[in-house]
UniProtKB/Swiss-Prot annotation:
The active site is at H41 (proton donor/acceptor). Keywords: Cobalamin biosynthesis, Isomerase. Catalyzes the conversion of precorrin-8X to hydrogenobyrinate. Substrate binds at S15, R38. It comes from the Bacteria. This is Precorrin-8X methylmutase. Gene3D superfamilies: Cobalamin biosynthesis CobH/CbiC, precorrin-8X methylmutase.
Length: 208
């Protein structure tokens, strides 16, 4: 029999201990540091900490929104699948409309992506919601456009889209002009569905 650690709780404990020992978390307040640890745990890269941009109130604001029952709006089915429902404090609805037939029709009409169309279809649910965006820069760009057009902003944007085209630019637009939204995103090309879901999971419950 191979010799390896089998206890899930101990694997988690040791993993988080290694992350806290190796990552530079000094610039983060304690609540944000806990989220960053989760992001690192998801991707295995401690230098992610160097690229996290955030507003000081993001954990408190997103946490309060979730506690009040706000929905979690996701840009992809993968983000939605990664959110641990048992961690959500108020049986919060997890919404992803990327696979909705209406998104396909709207995307064709707008000549954009289904992810962007899915965000637009969620416009009425935006006020006070938590947005988990990990896949599509176009989804974040469309969110920013909707707020510019008068839609009430969500409480927070978490994660950040991954990619080589538009990803860094969409996040920088959010950072430079937050439009009343709190945020925690990974700058540059990195991001992804797993990171977006991890950010929600970390904020949804104090359990590490």
């Amino acid at each position: 029999m191979l010799d390896y650690l089998r206890d899930a709780a101990e694997i988690y404990r040791r993993s988080f201990a290694v992350i806290r020992a190796e990552a530079d978390l000094a610039r983060f307040p304690a609540d944000v540091a806990r989220v960053v640890v989760r992001l690192i745990h998801t991707c295995g890269q401690v230098d992610v900490a160097e690229h996290v941009a955030y507003t000081d109130d993001v954990v408190a604001r997103a946490g309060a929104a979730l506690a009040a029952g706000a929905p979690v709006l996701c840009d992809s089915s993968m983000v939605a699948a990664g959110i641990t429902t048992s961690r959500l404090p108020a049986d919060n609805q997890i919404v992803s409309l990327v696979a909705d037939p209406r998104a396909t029709e709207l995307a064709a009409r707008r000549q954009t992506t289904r992810s962007a169309a899915g965000v637009e279809l969620c416009a009425e649910r935006l006020p006070g919601a938590v947005l988990a965006i990990g896949n599509a820069p176009t989804a974040l760009f469309r969110l920013l456009e909707l707020v510019d057009e008068g839609a009430p902003p969500p409480a927070a944007v978490l994660g950040g889209p991954v990619g080589f085209v538009g990803s860094a630019q969409a996040k920088e637009e959010l950072i430079e002009r937050p439009r009343g939204m709190s945020y925690l995103v990974v700058r540059g090309r990195r991001g992804g569905s797993a990171m977006a879901a991890a950010a929600v999971n970390a904020i949804a419950s104090d359990r590490e």
